UniProtKB/Swiss-Prot annotation:
This is Eukaryotic translation initiation factor 3 subunit H. It is found in: Cytoplasm. PANTHER family: EUKARYOTIC TRANSLATION INITIATION FACTOR 3 -RELATED. GO terms for biological process: formation of cytoplasmic translation initiation complex; negative regulation of proteasomal ubiquitin-dependent protein catabolic process; translational initiation. There is a cross-link at residue 303 (Glycyl lysine isopeptide (Lys-Gly) (interchain with G-Cter in SUMO2)). GO terms for cellular component: eukaryotic 43S preinitiation complex; eukaryotic 48S preinitiation complex; eukaryotic translation initiation factor 3 complex; eukaryotic translation initiation factor 3 complex, eIF3m. InterPro entries: eIF3h (IPR027524), eIF3h_C (IPR045810), JAMM/MPN+_dom (IPR000555), JAMM_MPN+_peptidase_M67A (IPR050242), MPN (IPR037518). It comes from the Eukaryota. Keywords: Cytoplasm, Initiation factor, Isopeptide bond, Phosphoprotein, Protein biosynthesis, Ubl conjugation. It comes from Mus musculus (Mouse). Residues 270-289 have a biased composition (Low complexity).
Length: 352
């Protein structure tokens, strides 16, 4: 994933300027107790995101962009967006922060909502739970509390149903990211698990009345589809690819568990050595005391037994979260196909 799109520096700069505007609009001056209960998206934004992926998304390459809108009480209204342009690392003259500011300034001149309220990203078979996404969303949410990230799945959408979800970091994870302490003890103290990292926010897509009337007319004019078309099974390629990605993440989790178990064994071994050293030291001092000799001076055990560095556990949580996402996708895929098989069987028995 390109650093320009998910680098915390550029995101924080542009979000910070938008954050003050959002605070003004709410009249709170950036209160910390507000929460987003719902995300309302204009149909234009959805079409722009889909069009952006169709024009620039290829294979595993993701597309990203900025979401614009405003906050109304506990509802985040996304009214417009613009994409990040595709460019290579050789484009040293490109300034992504300047690009964002110029785009928002241009939108303001034509009286379009220009407040920065989040960002969007496409995903490849649900592969979006990454450290880069975590860092970017933390940067956005730290600057503007109501910020969300929209995840668009083009593969699911191509199968006939729009897949667009909004996520935010949970308050617990925000506190851990602020402290930047991802040690096992810190995560255990904060009660952070992969299930408590992201929270999904309900999405409502809103269209104007004229667009709703047009869609109603188009639906009336559209050709009647085969009544049995909905019973067609989805392609097995999706299931195979999801299983392959799931196995890759399980392998990564296995390697991470091995590293953590090695750390625990080394720590336990060092504790035993420290305990044995203290016992020997105590026995030697007792012998010296019986001979009337002064005890040996105390030594700094931290210098003799340097503690092992605990591995950071955030990557493990992200891998576990991604595994959970793959499992949910596979569950949805198989449930739909099994339902179609049972319906097809019932229809066949009825016709016979």
């Amino acid at each position: 994933m390109a650093s320009r799109k998910e680098g915390t520096g550029s995101t924080a700069t542009s979000s910070g300027s938008a954050g003050g505007a959002v605070g003004k609009g709410k009249g709170k001056g950036g209160s910390g107790d507000s929460a987003v209960k719902q995300v309302q998206i204009d149909g234009l934004v959805v079409l722009k995101i889909i069009k952006h992926y169709q024009e620039e998304g290829q294979g595993t390459e993701v597309v990203q962009g900025v979401l614009l809108g405003l906050v109304v009480e506990d509802r985040l209204e996304i009214t417009n967006c613009f994409p990040f342009p595709q460019h290579t690392e050789d484009d040293a003259d490109f300034d992504e922060v300047q690009y964002q500011m110029e785009m928002m300034r241009s939108l303001r001149h034509v009286n379009i909502d220009h407040l920065h309220v989040g960002w969007y990203q496409s995903t490849y078979y649900g592969s979006f739970v990454t450290r880069a996404l975590l860092d970017s969303q933390f940067s956005y949410q730290h600057a503007i509390e109501e910020s969300v990230v929209l995840i668009y799945d083009p593969i699911k959408t191509a199968q006939g149903s729009l897949s667009l979800k909004a996520y935010r970091l949970t308050p617990k994870l925000m506190e851990v990211c602020k402290e930047k302490d991802f040690s096992p003890e810190a995560l255990k103290k904060a009660s952070i698990t992969f299930e408590h990292m992201f929270e999904e926010v309900p999405i409502v897509i809103k269209n104007s009345h004229l667009i709703n009337v047009l869609m109603w007319e188009l639906e009336k004019k559209s050709a009647v589809a085969d009544k049995h078309e909905l019973l067609s099974l989805a392609s097995s390629n999706h299931l195979g690819k999801s299983l392959q990605l799931l196995m890759d993440r399980v392998d990564e989790m296995s390697q991470d568990i091995i590293k953590y178990n090695t750390y625990m064994r080394n720590t336990s071994k060092q504790q035993q050595q420290k305990h044995q050293y203290q016992q020997r030291r105590q026995q030697e001092n007792m012998q010296r005391q019986s001979r009337g000799e002064p005890p040996l001076p105390e030594e700094d055990l931290s210098k003799l037994f340097k503690p092992h560095q605990a591995p950071a556990r955030m990557d493990s949580l992200l891998i576990a979260g991604q595994i959970n996402t793959y499992c949910q996708n596979i569950k949805e895929f198989t449930a739909q196909n099994l339902g179609k098989l049972f319906m097809a069987q019932a229809l066949q028995e009825y016709n016979n």
